[in-house]
A protein has these predicted regions:
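N-terminal acidic, proline/glycine-rich, low-complexity intrinsically disordered segments
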Residues: 1-12
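Long, folded non-catalytic interaction modules
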Residues: 164, 281-285, 337-340, 346-349, ...
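Low-complexity, serine/threonine/proline-enriched polar segments
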Residues: 292, 296-347
Length: 460
């Protein structure tokens, strides 16, 4: 057996290196150069450790912040409530004035406000029914856009934003063009909730819209409609607002009243402060009290596509009092001379007819209608229907002897569109009749603190 060479130089070399390493490590008599090198190495290691600790700290903070932000956003973003399961919530706290309650920390961002403002501006510019009577107001509306965009960007609360929108819409000086109030929204929603084929169903049932309008609270007491007998011989119907879903109840009250006083031959319809946009009520209510069937035909010109959903719904609904073929005739092909608006501003036109068939429930009675300076829109339309079909005597309780924008008789219902972020619905005048604008021709003007008493004196 061969013995290992204990004097193997290779082995000796390895042992020498290990020994040398131990000696160097344990040797405290280091050279200044070696000491400086070790200090530099130590500082470098400390810097590396500090960077690692900083990176881990930042990562830990992000791990905490990101999930917390997502949870916060989930809890505070507008919820996607289903339709129509939310309808009971929508009907809480009816209001006529759009006053917005606290959103508990979830307000609209500046970007959302600006996006809604841009939608409002662009939709109105493309679709508003411009004519010679409103061209100056329309141009002022467009010129003020930058000014109001800056105001809206700097607005602090949602309520400030909505007030600014209302101010901006008022520049156009058109009573049809405004933010839809909660009172009207609630009534329209109740009517259209089961009409799923209607475009109004989609607008009113938009989750963002429902979420917004359920948070609108009462700003003032809402005056309810009422029926009564004045001086034992005059039927009085007070309509401060229009609610199509309450017509059946109102007609029952009228039946009770006229049954208790069978000699009634005169009625007062009080439309004071009524500026409703609800044409559904007008057409349904009028049929009970007109003396004969009402028919009115018009050619309706329109500039954009917003009105098309309304025309489609009218054409598809066999029971609608409005009738139209909706064939989108090109305005440039219209050969008749138009003097009161610029035909080049309009894209299409369609014939539209309004036909209201008299209901024979009630006998014909003398009709007196009371309005004031706040009466507008569909209330004025109702007064015009009674005046044209039943020779109604229309009285305005106001000082101004001249016609105002509120006295205009609109020939076609307004179109509605949604501001996606805020969930507000905007009503817009989108139709222009071929004929000159009509304004209510009042039989008499009064200035009375007690207008019903004044009406009774007029009746005699």
């Amino acid at each position: 057996m061969t013995k290992r060479n204990r004097n193997n130089p290779s082995r000796k070399s390895k042992n020498s290196r290990k020994s040398a390493i131990r000696i160097i490590k344990d040797n405290e008599n280091l050279t200044p150069r070696e000491i400086a090198r070790r200090k530099r190495a130590k500082r470098e290691r400390e810097r590396i450790y500090q960077r690692r600790r900083l990176a881990l700290s930042v990562l830990g903070i992000l791990i905490i912040i990101i999930p917390s932000f997502l949870i916060y956003k989930k809890l505070n973003t507008y919820g996607k409530e289903g339709y129509p399961a939310f309808r009971d919530e929508v009907l809480d706290d009816l209001s006529k004035t759009a006053f917005v309650s606290s959103t508990e920390g979830r307000s609209l961002t500046s970007a959302e406000k600006n996006a809604d403002f841009d939608t409002l501006y662009e939709t109105i510019v493309k679709n508003f029914a411009v004519d010679k009577s409103n061209i100056e107001s329309f141009e002022k509306f467009t010129q003020k856009s930058d000014e109001y965009r800056k105001k809206i960007t700097s607005s602090k609360t949602d309520q400030d934003f909505f007030i600014l929108l209302g101010e901006y819409l008022a520049i156009i000086n058109d009573s049809y063009t405004k933010i839809l109030d909660k009172e009207s929204y609630t009534d329209l929603f109740e009517y259209y909730k089961n009409k799923k084929e209607s475009s109004m169903n989609e607008i009113l049932g938009n989750p963002q819209v429902v979420n917004r309008y359920k948070r609108i609270i009462n700003d003032k007491n809402v005056i309810e409609s009422s029926v009564g007998i004045e001086k034992g011989y005059v039927l009085r119907i007070t309509l401060p607002n229009f609610k199509v879903n309450e017509i059946e109840k109102m007609i029952d009250e009228v039946i009770k009243s006229v049954t208790s006083a069978p000699g009634i031959s005169t009625m007062i319809i009080d439309l004071s402060d009524n500026n409703s946009l609800n044409n559904l009520f007008v057409n349904e209510f009028a049929k009970y009290f007109i003396h004969q069937d009402y028919n009115k035909e018009d050619l309706i010109f329109y500039r954009g596509n917003l009105i098309e959903n309304t025309l489609k719904d009218m054409k598809a609904d066999e029971n609608s009092p409005y009738q139209t073929a909706f064939i989108k005739n090109t305005s440039s092909n219209y050969k008749e001379k138009i003097e009161h608006f610029n035909l080049d501003s309009y894209m299409y036109y369609d014939p539209v007819a309004l036909k209201i068939i008299k209901d024979t429930t009630f006998a014909s009675r003398n009709i007196y209608i009371l309005t004031n300076s706040n009466t507008a829109n569909e209330a004025i339309k109702l007064a015009s229907i009674f005046k044209d079909s039943s020779n109604a005597y229309v009285v305005k309780n106001a000082l101004d002897p001249n016609p105002t924008a509120a006295d205009r008789i609109y020939e076609f219902p307004p179109s509605l569109f949604v501001l996606d972020h805020s969930g507000l619905i905007i009503s817009l005048n989108t139709a222009r009749s071929e004929k000159p604008n009509r304004y209510m021709d009042y039989n008499q003007r009064i200035n009375s603190k007690y207008p019903i008493s004044s009406m009774l004196s007029i009746i005699g």
